[in-house]
Amino acid sequence: MLARKLGISADYLETGSEIRDTDERELQIADAELELRLAEITDEAEAKLKRLRADALEAGDTVAASRANIALGLAAAHGGRNSEAIELLESGLELSPVSASARPDVYATLGKAYAASGRPKRAVELFESCLAEVSQEAPDDFAAQVRFTTYLSYALTDLGDLRRAEEVLEEALGKAEEMTDAYSRVRLYWGVARLNDIGGRPAAALDYIRRAIALLDVTDDTLHLARAHILSAAILLTQDRPEEATRHHNLAEKLLGSNAEPEDLSGLYADQSKAAARLGNVALALAKAEAAVAALAGDEYPREMGLGQWALAEARALDGNTDGADSAFREASMLLEAHGHRREYVDVYRSWGKFLRRAGREEEALEVLERATDLAAEQVADAQAHQAE
């Protein structure tokens, strides 16, 4: 009654504050989240979120603690700390679950961290669950379904199940007329381009990535436009068109800026190294390959590290550093066979075998090339089995 007469809230009369502790905490978390997005160095914002998380847990405010954990997890993923990101995001979702429809970015980041850490099966399970959830909760939200269909196709491709990846994308393409927003089409075209590239169909891959780039050109989404140029360049390199690939690399580098994610930078540098090597620029090939490896910290991105080591091996071979090239080829083949796509590790074994043959190490070359042949034969057998089904 007194609060009403004075024109103030009961909380203010009791505490001297216009908002409750939970609201104040939520406001501070929102401020720290914004700082994370805008700041180049995020240490201070992360420290603030950790303090707020501790306060929230002490107060029994699980919603705020969850939000702080999720924000910290997203920051860890952006910094390439995938193991930490997985732990934080899983903990945040356990404290206070949020739906895939409400926070698709959280589930996308978690799945991406699983895949980057060499756990594609877990990523597939997550995205299958997300797709089922959004299909049930919002059957008319085709954009959300396309988002998680595309993520699922990525995870299936990483797992090596190209047939099922193709099936889920074909189903989405069949509903393409229902899409009204550009981003749904971009995601879908991107997924089809990536699948065709990995499946050894570069012409079809280029067709779809060009469609994605055309749509992204009319948006302000520079990050995804940069990634589209990187994928386009990678496809062009498979067709031995390094000059055209370099033009896409230059555009991507400008669009990424200085605050890019480690895997984006490493992938760009590795492909720039390969393009430079094919154009005979040894110094640039070495510099870019070394940058590709240096962009990744620890063992957070095993596949990307394998691709970086492969680029470094090619550059060292071109430079005449036989021992250094052999060491990098060995590391690349080990990482890519464990974490890469089959076409990648077949190709790295072939490249390594050709290098050993040029170096006069015929016995070692024969062993490596036999390994490449065996892996390629498995790939053909799998493809024939899928066709028979």
Question: What positions do the PLM features span?
Answer:
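Short coil/turn linker motifs that delimit alpha-helical repeat modules in TPR/alpha-solenoid proteins
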Residues: 41, 60-61, 98-101, 119, ...
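Amphipathic alpha-helical segments of tetratricopeptide repeats
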Residues: 50-57, 90-95, 128-138, 170-181, ...
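Mid-protein regulatory/catalytic core that forms ligand/cofactor-binding pockets
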Residues: 47-167
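Tandem amphipathic alpha-helical repeat scaffolds
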Residues: 27-41, 66-80, 102-119, 144-160, ...
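DNA major-groove recognition helix of helix-turn-helix/homeodomain DNA-binding modules
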Residues: 1-12, 18
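C-terminal non-catalytic interaction modules
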Residues: 3-6, 301-308, 318, 322-389
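Eukaryotic tandem repeat interaction scaffolds
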Residues: 209, 215-338
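Helix-turn-helix repeat elements of alpha-solenoid scaffolds
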Residues: 37-51, 77-91, 118-130, 161-171, ...
